[in-house]
Amino acid sequence: MLQEDRDELTMNQKKSPMLFRLIKWTVRTCYHKVSLQGSEHLPDTPCVVVANHCQLHGPITSELYFPAPRVTWCAGQMMELKEVPGYAFQDFWSQKPKRSHWYYKLCSYAMAPLASYIFTHADTIAVRHDARILSTFKKTVAALQEGNNVIIFPEHDVKYNHIIYEFQDRFVNVAKHYYRKSGKALPFVPMYIAPKLKTAVIGEPIYFDPERPMDEERERICNELKNSITALGEALPLHTVVPYRNIPKKLYPKNRPNQEVSL
């Protein structure tokens, strides 16, 4: 089956396969329950929710506990069996000590069948950083027009502050395509996920302004989202932040620097 066909199936299927439902039930049973705060900030209209990735915790939280209809952007490589090992090692484990790389490369191959199955059958939209991104935008606009919210984890390797990493900013272009189709300004909603507190917090929406140049809007929206997510994180009780990168746990930062942390 072609990737685009799989994407359509993922977004339109009425009932997930039994195996996927069993996997999801198992994860829900084993994973801690997440308390969601700030859901009153979700607009009455569909929106794009932008959150910190916090490794696997972000996707798990969005899949199990987001309180409204949603689909989630997913790296297209994680939906292709042959591409999972290389992408998984680079994205999850490449910063581990070099002496252990052989082990994590084995893990990358071992996880490939299950990972590609899960991400293909979850409510996801594949993201590719090439010409296929236009297909991603098209499917995203369609999902929004069907009444779904869209969850995006746009962080990449460059650190922004102690809470969050810099964003790959092209996701903001969804707002331009959505405005052309609907005539509506798309809201972007910040969300901070704190696995150590078993909590996720939703902040106030930031609206796309179609009258401003796109380059300026990308920068403005990304900066406001990053700062809002940071403020949401800092306002919570003192805790250890689970960063985007899978670095040694002893290097995990605190939500308020220079304070003692108990969680």
Language model segments and positions:
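Non-catalytic C-terminal accessory region of glycerolipid acyltransferases
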Residues: 2-7, 129-263
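Catalytic core of membrane glycerolipid acyltransferases/transacylases, capturing the structured
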Residues: 44-129
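N-terminal membrane-anchoring alpha-helices
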Residues: 1-31, 259-262
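Amphipathic coiled-coil/heptad-repeat helices and related helical stalk/stem segments
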Residues: 35, 55, 111, 133-137, ...
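A short, well-structured juxtamembrane/interface segment
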Residues: 22-46
